């Protein structure tokens, strides 16, 4: 389901994009973009938002302002929604996901969320509800703890030791990323950048260490952002590392940081 959704959504974005900015056909693909080009603006915008990585202490989000659109009420300080999820589907086997989402409310300075394990049916690409496990969690003192008793010690330990990508990801070398594929839709506004990474990339090594990623294939990095390109605050920032993407075989990691109105 996630595989199909992200393929469809990405294609829609590409079709609606007013600017599809790739490598200049008439020049070397490694040539640096002009300062005023849309490509340069997109990369500069991502550089600003990715500069906040890592945020080791999630409680720092309580004091962090984000991009506010017309949906926010005047007295609402907003809520940060952070998510990290690994998706694995060995060849010929069922797709399984495991990850966590946390709502960090700046008004109440409280954070609650869920740790979720899912299986995706191969027949209809839908979540198998009989195989879905959801555990409520909260954050106290920068630590994630279950709000209910969990008999499975392995799951309990995984929750307590869980780290979001935003806590350890690092993009200090982002300016050196070359040969990106860019798209931009000013109406939304949404924009994206895609890069081919190498296995010696810091973030790739971190993901391999934490999630026992079996393939030796180097991943592609897809960045998706939302909000004003000229605004340095974060509205929506989605990160996807795709190691394997084939019919019946997938390995990818999703992470997102989004600033939303409080409920």
Curated annotation (Swiss-Prot):
Q: Which organism is it from?
A: Staphylococcus aureus (strain bovine RF122 / ET3-1)
Lipidation sites (N-palmitoyl cysteine): 23
Recorded protein name is Uncharacterized lipoprotein SAB0394
Q: Any keyword rRNA-binding? A: no
InterPro entries, A to Z: Csa, Csa_sf
Principal localisation: membrane
Where does this polypeptide localize?
A: Cell membrane
Instruction: Mention any Pfam family matching this sequence.
Output: DUF576
Please list which residues make up the signal peptide.
1-22
What membrane topology does the annotation report for this chain? Lipid-anchor
Covalently lipidated residues (S-diacylglycerol cysteine) read: 23
Which UniProt keywords are listed? Cell membrane, Lipoprotein, Membrane, Palmitate, Signal
What family is this? Belongs to the staphylococcal tandem lipoprotein family.
Gene Ontology CC annotation, any one: plasma membrane
């Amino acid at each position: 389901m996630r595989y199909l959704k992200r393929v469809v959504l990405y294609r829609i974005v590409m079709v609606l994009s007013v600017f599809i900015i790739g490598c200049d056909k008439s020049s070397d693909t490694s040539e640096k973009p002009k300062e005023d080009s849309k490509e340069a603006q997109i990369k500069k915008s991502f550089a600003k938002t990715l500069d906040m990585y890592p945020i080791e202490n999630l409680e720092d989000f309580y004091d962090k302002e984000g991009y506010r659109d017309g949906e926010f009420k005047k007295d609402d300080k907003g809520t940060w929604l952070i998510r990290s999820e690994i998706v694995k589907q060995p060849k010929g086997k069922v797709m399984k996901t495991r990850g966590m989402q946390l709502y960090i409310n700046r008004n109440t300075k409280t954070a609650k969320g869920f740790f979720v394990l899912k299986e995706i049916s191969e027949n209809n690409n839908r979540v198998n509800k009989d195989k879905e496990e959801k555990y409520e969690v909260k954050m106290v003192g920068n630590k994630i703890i279950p709000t209910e008793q969990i008999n499975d010690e392995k799951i309990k330990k995984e929750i307590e030791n869980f780290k979001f990508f935003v806590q350890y990801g690092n993009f200090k070398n982002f300016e050196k990323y070359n040969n990106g594929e860019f798209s931009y839709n000013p109406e939304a506004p949404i924009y994206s950048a895609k890069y081919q990474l190498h296995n010696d990339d810091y973030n790739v090594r971190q993901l391999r260490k934490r999630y026992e990623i079996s393939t030796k294939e180097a991943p592609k990095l897809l960045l998706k952002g939302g909000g004003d390109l000229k605004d340095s605050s974060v509205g929506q920032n989605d990160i996807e590392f795709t190691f394997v993407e084939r019919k019946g075989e997938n390995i990818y990691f999703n992470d997102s940081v989004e600033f939303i109105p409080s409920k």
